[in-house]
A protein has these predicted regions:
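Short acidic-glycine-tyrosine-enriched beta hairpin
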Residues: 95-110, 218-234
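Glycine- and acidic-residue-biased ligand/ion/polar-headgroup-sensing regions
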Residues: 77-79, 83-89, 200-213, 217
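Structural motif
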Residues: 68, 88, 113, 123, ...
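Bacterial Sec-dependent N-terminal signal peptides
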Residues: 1-22
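A short, N-terminal "cap"/entry segment at the start of jelly-roll beta-barrel domains
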Residues: 18-57, 121, 125, 134-179
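Ligand-binding loop in jelly-roll beta-barrel domains
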Residues: 110-136, 233-255
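Conserved short histidine dyad/triad with adjacent acidic residue
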Residues: 43-45, 60-75, 168, 183-199
């Protein structure tokens, strides 16, 4: 009996630890984040922990001066992608380089060499999303889907609709994710994108511009340009534009 009680206590301890390690579904306000000044960059830590699909995920922003790099080109066993907030960033994946501007995206599968240089004459800021999956890494699946890749904001067609419009970036598997889908929504002033709903996929909403309110479960939280919203699997949510101008935001889901 004492042995069973001990097992229950130990299990409860690790369950509590796991819960603490889970990334919280909420609005992460960019202006509230501490700025860590390093030799080559400024860094703002957004969140770090685990989720339903990922054993580890970490998000931060990096800001670098013109002509500077945050670090030397490198490779690692995690998967990673970036979204450029402002400035002009030269992104290199293996032997392929491209200068990307605000709203552009790049993903690096495990093992691929990648690096960044500020190619403009003003500061460049970008979001970094680094993660590893609970399931085994599938490099073959990633390579069949196209491997590491970049998406230039200027190449994405805007498709208007009655609530605003959409830019479809991609939907594909990666080495760590069976499904990764990304689009950008333009939501007209004063309206909801949709009614409160749930889905199995985890989701991040990244505000490019505007003033919104996101319902997360039973709470309502404001999110403005630059802020990030994390929505865990099957949590009730809905977003509304509470400003006087269109809001623009990334929405990306993974499973």
């Amino acid at each position: 009996m004492k042995f069973i009680v001990l097992i229950v206590i130990v299990f409860s301890h690790f369950s509590l630890f796991a819960q603490k390690d889970t990334v919280e579904s909420k609005v992460y306000v960019l202006n509230n984040l501490n700025v860590e000044k390093q030799d080559t960059r400024e860094r703002r830590q957004i969140a770090e922990g685990s989720g339903a699909v990922l054993s580890y995920m970490e998000w931060h922003t990096t800001t670098i001066d013109p002509g500077k790099s945050p670090h030397a080109s490198h490779r690692h066993d995690d998967e990673e992608y970036i979204i450029i907030k402002e400035g002009q960033l030269k992104v290199t994946i293996n032997d392929n380089s491209k200068v990307l501007g605000p709203g552009s995206f790049a993903l690096f599968i495990p093992g691929d060499m990648h690096g960044f240089v500020n190619a403009g004459d003003t500061k460049a800021t970008y979001y970094v999303f680094r993660y590893r999956s609970k399931a085994p890494v599938d490099l073959e699946r990633a390579k069949k889907a196209g491997g590491s890749f970049m998406v230039d904001w200027n190449d994405i067609v805007f498709k208007p609709h009655d609530k605003g419009g959409i830019r479809n970036f991609f939907e594909r598997p990666t080495a760590m994710l069976k499904r990764f889908e990304m689009h950008v929504t333009t939501l007209n002033a004063g309206i909801k994108s949709h009614d409160p709903h749930t889905h199995g996929a985890e989701e991040i909403v990244l505000l490019v511009k505007g003033n919104t309110e996101m319902q997360i479960a039973q709470s309502h939280q404001k999110a403005d340009g630059g802020d990030l919203i994390y929505l865990s699997s099957n949590i009730l949510h809905a977003i509304q534009n509470i400003g006087n101008e269109p809001s623009i935001y990334f929405a990306f889901q993974w499973q």
